[in-house]
Amino acid sequence: MRESFSIAGLVRPELEKLMPYEAKLYPEAIKLDANENPYPFPESLSSKIGELAAGDVLSRYPDGAALELRRDIAEYVGTEPEQVMVGNGSDELILNILLTFGTGGRVLITNPTFSMYKIHSQIAGARPIPVPRRGDFSIDVPALVCYARQPEAKVVFLCTPNNPTGNSTTLEEIEGVLQQVSCLVVVDQAYLEFGGEDALPLLKRYPNLIILRTFSKAFALAGLRVGYMLANTDVLRQIEKVRQPFNLNAFSQAAARTVLANRDVFKEQIQTVLEQREVVQRGLKSIKGVDSYPSATNYILFRTNHDSKVIFQGLLERGVLIRSLGGPELPGFLRVSIGTPEQNTKFLQALDQVMQQVGRD
């Protein structure tokens, strides 16, 4: 007699309430929801990437150590290649950190912040512990240190500039945590090219510091998923044990190297985004019923007195896609990425129309 199969008994208990991540597609809308570089990737650089990926590069496994890319990154940030690890986006690196150090322990997350810290903690079999930020979204250093000094605390995540709030944590605050804890402190600086203080100077003094960065935002490689981390060699040596072989494909490695060699092109785009950020801030402040928050990033957090889903849907009906936040931590809040001047104008016009409509309803 054939045994009956029940998948329920095989799934890890901590995954039962975890929902698959879904990124819905709205191809007809202006996409201002994911904090991407709004400008097309330069054609001149696309051809250079093609040259690097020619011949047998695509038919052979990539350099598993990504040595040339790590050398380029080290030169860009000002460290040694041995202190650099690359990954298939920062998500892979976050998960690998947690698989190495977090499983079975507590992971401290300064909510509201990047949602994937909690999700990857659950996947890795760690227990995510929220340590709420203050009313102005700054981190509560004393509370964080108190939690981090408990025996089961393994990893602290600090996102700066913080997603989705847009504010940055000072080096003094980061060091205030590092000085008082013995667990790992992961400082996610995905948006550093747009603002905030570089945490790299702290790396020499604190062996428990890990810094995360990415090519997805300022460098327009979100579609190729290239992230990297900077850490003490002893820390990276342990994470190497869980890293998948050949985890970053040859094409992505070639693209990242090309971007770094031509980063002046992206500096111009970054400057334009920063200028447009101020335009959008002024526009938001001019719309009745909208409160916006300061930003050190390529997006702006704002809130209204209405359900964020209603505002989101009203914008979508007018061809603009942004991020609806809501929930108990951010009621009525939304986040908009900075787009091109034309996209930003359409967003502001659409939001003004939506706010007038909900005000009449």
Residues covered by each model-derived region:
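PLP-dependent enzyme catalytic core of the Aspartate aminotransferase-like
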Residues: 172, 314-318, 323, 327-361
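PLP-dependent aminotransferase-like
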Residues: 99-158
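N-terminal "arm"/small-domain region of PLP-dependent enzymes with the aminotransferase-like
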Residues: 1-60, 145, 152
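Active-site phosphate-binding strand-loop segment of PLP-dependent enzymes
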Residues: 135-193
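PLP-dependent aminotransferase class I/II
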Residues: 208-286, 291-293
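Phosphate-binding glycine-rich loop
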Residues: 67-106
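Short acidic capping loops at alpha-helix termini that bridge into adjacent secondary structure
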Residues: 80-84, 105-106, 189, 207-208, ...
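Conserved PLP-binding catalytic core of the aspartate aminotransferase-like
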Residues: 273-274, 284-318
